[in-house]
Amino acid sequence: MSISSDTSGSVPGSPIDLEPESETICHWQSCEQDLLTLDNLVHHIHNGTTSNLRLISNINSILDHIGNRRPKYTCEWDDCPRKGMVQTSRFALVAHLRSHTGEKPFICSVPECDRSFTRSDALAKHMRTVHEADTLRPSDPIPKAHPMHPQNVANAMVQSAREARAQQQMHGVGNTNEDVENWLDAASMPKTSHDMYRLQKRKLQWVKEERTMLANHLEALERKLIDARNRKEKILNEIVKQVDPSISR
């Protein structure tokens, strides 16, 4: 997905209220280089170059745009009402320039949604209003008490799988992991990529639980093996002493 996909929301300090169309020409101090794509333009502005140097006709015009570790950062975009005004930081200047370029780096994480935004708060508003994530910001973890918390979803799936496996045992049906895997596939029937993602997370939780159970079983067997070896050594020592008391192991 391109970073120039549709969006809503604007950048504080934007020269216009409407969201700009994606730009490909650099208007920083009359640079006027056409970078052909928004990705190339953003790379050009941020790094003073482009990922495709063959696009550049005047190498001197691409140097020292935003720069790094400068004492002050100002927008030098032609026709910008805030041109020459000092920004609070390089980060603030980068955010401001999105109003000129149309860059939208904040992408909705819902698989079936293709929206992207210039600002993180615009993405948060989209998540609340469109995807009904009322109590969560995009960066917030899902509360453990929430029914959609991965652990709760996984636990419910594991419990259902255990019940199905118990039914299989009662009827003399094999209870291999493959049986449970097939049951999970048949029960879930994912219809969207988001459903598939959730299913795979549930399967991952199932695998982790099985791994923990097997690790505990292995640890118990290793303890039994050590005890058996110790008993063997003790018995062997007793036998050797009886055969030849002068021999000490």
Curated annotation (Swiss-Prot):
Gene3D superfamilies: Classic Zinc Finger (3.30.160.60)
UniProt keyword RNA-binding present: no
SMART domains named among the record's database cross-references: ZnF_C2H2
GO molecular function, one term: zinc ion binding
Pfam families: zf-C2H2 (PF00096), zf-C2H2_15 (PF23561)
Listed PANTHER family: TRANSCRIPTIONAL ACTIVATOR CUBITUS INTERRUPTUS
Protein known as: INO80 complex subunit 1
Highest classification ranks of the organism: Eukaryota, Fungi, Dikarya, Ascomycota, Taphrinomycotina
Gene (UniProt): iec1
